[in-house]
Regions:
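N-terminal Rossmann NAD(P)H-binding glycine-rich loop of SDR-like oxidoreductase domains
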Residues: 2-29
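A short helix->loop->beta-strand "cap" motif at the edges of active sites that frequently abuts
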Residues: 109-114, 146-147
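Structural motif
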Residues: 8, 72-73, 114
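Residues in the short beta-alpha loop(s) of Rossmann-like NAD(P)-binding domains
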Residues: 38-39, 220
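SDR active-site strand-loop-helix element
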Residues: 12, 35, 77, 115-120, ...
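Oxidoreductase cofactor-interface core, primarily capturing Rossmann-like NAD(P)-dependent enzymes
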Residues: 2, 17, 22, 45, ...
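Conserved glycine-rich Rossmann-like NAD(P)H-binding loop of the short-chain dehydrogenase/reductase
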Residues: 30-38
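NAD(P)H-binding glycine-rich loop region in Rossmannoid oxidoreductase-like domains
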Residues: 40, 47-110, 121-125
Length: 223
């Protein structure tokens, strides 16, 4: 009896600690293509069973469509923080929307069944409002061509080696007194990385999660 084909997932934004862990975890059940942004990052990755690493220029619609061809699902973890050499005059929000549009358009053309977007929960204040608006716009861009979209909104994801965890550790150990903006003085509900992976896995296997938004967090609310 022929073995059933594994469903294929493209993980966009797999270069960070969260994306790398998500890719490796999903490869236990799916065939995973993990995307990084440069060939330098690609050299640091080792393939594993049912896990391959690819470099992709996210601003190139041709490159994006090439890597998404044949994929059943798209996990979208891309967050632009600073301009690149290709787009050095653009604002981060413009780049976020351009990249999201490239992936959404290609996902629709190639018949991707579902996009899962890991966004963020940000509360109050001017800066956080701007970030929240940007992420809402990214979610809208990912859904505009009709591919079913699931949005998972998380606060701080506690993951070994993540930028947020390293930043908090450096602040706690090196700065005895820290002045923080008003928007940062809010209650947070951090979530462990394994719980994020479980949420993504659940959404992949349950059709009722499509075209739905979920706020995910751990059991503790902290300041």
């Amino acid at each position: 009896m022929p073995q059933q084909r594994r469903r294929k997932i493209l993980v966009a934004g797999a270069g960070g600690s969260i994306g790398s862990a998500v890719s490796r975890a999903l490869a236990k059940q799916y065939e995973v293509v993990a995307l990084v942004g440069s060939h330098e990052q690609l050299q640091e990755r080792e393939p594993a069973p049912f896990l391959s690493w690819r470099a992709c220029e996210p601003f190139s619609r041709r490159d994006v469509e090439k890597v998404i061809t044949g994929c059943d699902y798209l996990i979208y973890l891309v967050h632009t923080r600073v301009p690149t050499a290709r787009m050095d005059q653009a604002e981060c929000e413009d780049m976020d929307l351009l990249i999201a549009d490239n992936f959404a358009r290609s996902a629709n053309r190639q018949g991707v069944k579902q996009i899962i977007y890991l966004g963020g929960i940000i509360q109050g204040g001017n800066i956080s409002s701007e970030l929240l608006e940007r992420r809402n716009e990214v979610a809208e861009a990912l859904s505009i061509y009709g591919t079913p979209l699931t949005v998972l909104r998380a606060g701080l994801v506690v993951a070994p080696g993540s930028n947020a965890v390293r930043l908090l550790a450096n602040i706690a150990t090196r700065l005895p007194i820290v002045l923080i903006p008003q928007w940062a003085d809010k209650r947070q509900q951090p979530i462990a990385l394994p719980d994020v992976i479980r949420a993504i896995s659940y959404c992949l296997t349950n059709h009722e999660t499509r075209n739905t938004n979920y706020d995910i967090g751990g059991p503790m609310v902290l300041t």
